[in-house]
Swiss-Prot record:
GO cellular component: cytosol
Single Gene Ontology BP annotation: L-proline biosynthetic process
InterPro entries, sorted: AceGlu_kinase-like_sf (IPR036393), Asp/Glu/Uridylate_kinase (IPR001048), G5K_ProB (IPR041739), Glu/AcGlu_kinase (IPR001057), Glu_5kinase (IPR011529), Glu_5kinase/COase_Synthase (IPR005715), Glutamate_5-kinase_CS (IPR019797), PUA (IPR002478)
Residues of the PUA domain: 291-367
Keyword RNA-binding on entry: no
Binding-site residues for substrate, renumbered to this chain: 64, 151, 165
Entry keywords, A to Z: Amino-acid biosynthesis, ATP-binding, Cytoplasm, Kinase, Nucleotide-binding, Proline biosynthesis, Transferase
One GO MF term: glutamate 5-kinase activity
NCBIfam families: proB
Superkingdom per UniProt: Archaea
UniProt name for this protein: Glutamate 5-kinase
Lineage of the species this protein comes from: Archaea, Methanobacteriati, Methanobacteriota, Stenosarchaea group, Methanomicrobia
Pathway membership, UniProt: Amino-acid biosynthesis; L-proline biosynthesis; L-glutamate 5-semialdehyde from L-glutamate: step 1/2
Binding site for ATP: 17, 185-186
Amino acid sequence: MTEREQFFRDVNKIVIKIGTSSITRKGCDHTRENCNIDPAFMESIAFQVSELRKQGKEVIIVSSGAIGVGLNELGIAPKPREIPIRQAAAAVGQSMLMQDWSRAFSRYGMKVAQILLTYEFYSDRVTYLNLRNSISTLLEYGVVPIINENDCTCTNEIEAIFGDNDKLSAMVASKIDADLLIILSDIDGLFDRNPKTHIDAKLLTIVKKITPEIESYGGDPTSFKGVGGMRTKIKAAKICSMAGCYVVIANSDVEDVILKIASGEEIGTLFLAERHIQKNRARWIILARASGTVRVDAGAKAAVLGKNSLLPAGVVDVEGTFDRGDVVKLECDGKIFAKGITDYTSEELIKIKGVHTDQIENVLGYSNYNNVIKKENIGILEELN
């Protein structure tokens, strides 16, 4: 078994970021200014995702290209400075992108879901929890989430924050506890100098630690349509590395590139994850200050210890006042055995304690979540050490 195969042996949740140049490159004319979506490329991605799904892996896509495609559709020259024009192009291009993604995945019997994000998803805790829960639910139903920045309503300079979604993909990967982020573009990986201007540039196959020297290899953006140069990709790798997520930067032109990367083939540049840092978000949950206590019965305790979610039927009592998104202690027979991030407030839990999931709506008048605490939001105390 090769080193990469060992690294990726337990990879389960994968985020795939696809750059503008990859989605449109084969659909460009000789001027490289008028670009259309490349349906064949999208079908290739859909096929590879379907194969990963057969292996039991979860896949999320972060797709760029809305502005570039929209500009072409509206007959506007590339990279206009006026933000309203770019926002309009994003609105037109995004709908076209989703139509083509839906068409590509439908050929393999899969459905897709559009998720448009702004920077607030990262800074607002409740919004972040909603994102996690939404993506988790979509994956449970076999739907492929396709994420993009909401350029149409962005109040900051479009793409200035996320850099053609490089940073966005890293933030998504880190927040949903992905094991691997694959960044596909029109470049083979990270070189020690710009390969487009230096024929002797050397490809780095592995980066064990992102040092100032590694960051200096970033250079300036080189892609004509996208805004995500190597510098933003290195920053994305840095975010993921600290969250315990591997990153591979590779060329989307490689046949079955996603499948080859996931199987451990040495393609592109691999940035190692700092697995000892936040390897399991449960450590953070366990060390966080609890806002209250949820008492559960023995059956619920056994389910939680067995890596299952906490259901309202197993809740016996609630102590303290807390909101959705707060960390609470889980207690059984007078002993605290776990902590978790609750999806319901203390007031709501008091009303639905002991209630079966299908009765939540009858009690509250609504049912946002089937679980009180999702399994990925639980930390078992005995696992801290």
